[in-house]
Amino acid sequence: MSMTEQEARAWIEGRVPRGTMAGLEKLVAMILDEMPRQNLIAASTAESIWTRHIVDSAQLVPMVGKGGPLRWIDLGSGAGFPGMVVALMLPELRMTLVESRRKRIDFLRFMAESLGIADRVTVAGQRLEMLESSPHDVISARAFAPLDRLLPLAHRFSHDATLWLLPKGRSAASELEAVTTSWQGDFRVVPSMTDPEAAIIVASQVQPRGKGQKGRR
């Protein structure tokens, strides 16, 4: 299915408290205000930011089971999608945003401070390869790298129960097929709410083949 901007805002408003909605509106305003200075999102998507970026990020939240505080790492956060949106929607969350471009690092930190969530949102301003290994409960990556590059890079940030949420375009099925000989786990391809040609790879128990039998596609 696809959404209009009005439908996207209504979808969010029906799922978050008023204060969270205000935070998301402020996030949108800050990103649009910054656009003349750096290309945070494609100019062609600015008029559909609620559909293409806010709801596209927020649709990941219901995929995470309810429980205690989560440690979430978002790879290649860019303008803060999905990581900053998720952090606003889940106040118990501890979020790490990984971004290597200096102007975007500074902007992500500015947004976290301005939104009042800097105490639980860490911006790791370096390349993923240089980041110290640590286990996280959720790993997300939106337009960061193809799956055959992403899994080897990011696996050291997972544990046995880590949930992987990987928004993809029309390449989701082919990217998944490309890793079946080298990786095992429970993999699903879930249609995106915001683009009929896009999908989300949802995975758990992800392991290199030969490193244990924790599930199969």
Curated annotation (Swiss-Prot):
Class of enzymatic activity (EC top level): transferase
UniProt: S-adenosyl-L-methionine binding residues: 76, 81, 128-129, 142
Bilayer-spanning residue ranges: none
E.C. code: 2.1.1.170
GO cellular component: cytosol
Pfam family, one: GidB
Compartments (UniProt record): Cytoplasm
Protein family according to the UniProt entry: Belongs to the methyltransferase superfamily. RNA methyltransferase RsmG family.
Protein name, UniProt field: Ribosomal RNA small subunit methyltransferase G
Species of the source: Rhizorhabdus wittichii (strain DSM 6014 / CCUG 31198 / JCM 15750 / NBRC 105917 / EY 4224 / RW1) (Sphingomonas wittichii)
